[in-house]
């Protein structure tokens, strides 16, 4: 398996473009930060694959956030990815969740929020109802209504060689007016034959050849996908000094230290009374080192 890679490809004669995402370590890092139930791990994997596929459509510097919200036992699953394919994610749940729980079992009545944030330009946000049995179907409906581009997604989460992995494919008509519905349906039928093990394990070139060996496929340079939460001790320190000193002193008196926990990666940053005093000292504003 080409670990943690995004591959873009184009059917030049058919005006259809495609994407392939294969993840192992990046997905494993994301689900290891908390003791997620198996079904929640699966949903995180699906949303992670979907986010990487959608982030690949960005034609500018920026990020996409996919956020599932609901009134069920899983209240939130959120994945953020940027144009450099740096991703992070977290989920909120309560109670016991069956291993075979479906999307609707977990979220109940809910929706998907898609937020696109360019570094320059206006922020866009769309809200999509959970229409369909799977996340892939929900997103296909979104593309049909908002982009008016025929789009299909295949998203799989499972294990390969005993390790968690997630993968997916996307097909979309290129908006040049040349792609036909018949050509797209032909490629859909070919892609429907993909097996989980092939999607998890085969190199991109071999996988695409198995599926589309009668077609002319242009495969572009792949892009690495990496887990990056963005937390640091410095950022935690900066957050502490935004809180009133009296409130921080109360925490120190009660707990002996101020601790900030990153839900994305599971790291806890702890500051004792001496370190807190250093943060509030005038010299800290001039770039003193945090230990």
Swiss-Prot record:
It is found in: Cytoplasm. Pfam families: HSP33. Its main location: cytoplasm. Keywords: Chaperone, Cytoplasm, Disulfide bond, Redox-active center, Zinc. One of its GO terms (molecular function) is protein folding chaperone. GO terms for cellular component: cytoplasm. Coiled coil: none annotated. GO terms for biological process: protein refolding. InterPro entries: Heat_shock_Hsp33, Heat_shock_Hsp33_C, Heat_shock_Hsp33_N, Hsp33_helix_hairpin_bin_dom_sf. Disulfide bonds join 229-231, 262-265. Under oxidizing conditions two disulfide bonds are formed involving the reactive cysteines. Under reducing conditions zinc is bound to the reactive cysteines and the protein is inactive. Belongs to the HSP33 family. Redox regulated molecular chaperone. Protects both thermally unfolding and oxidatively damaged proteins from irreversible aggregation. Plays an important role in the bacterial defense system toward oxidative stress. NCBIfam families: PRK00114.1 (NF001033). This is 33 kDa chaperonin. It comes from Vibrio cholerae serotype O1 (strain ATCC 39315 / El Tor Inaba N16961). The lineage of its organism: Bacteria, Pseudomonadati, Pseudomonadota, Gammaproteobacteria, Vibrionales.
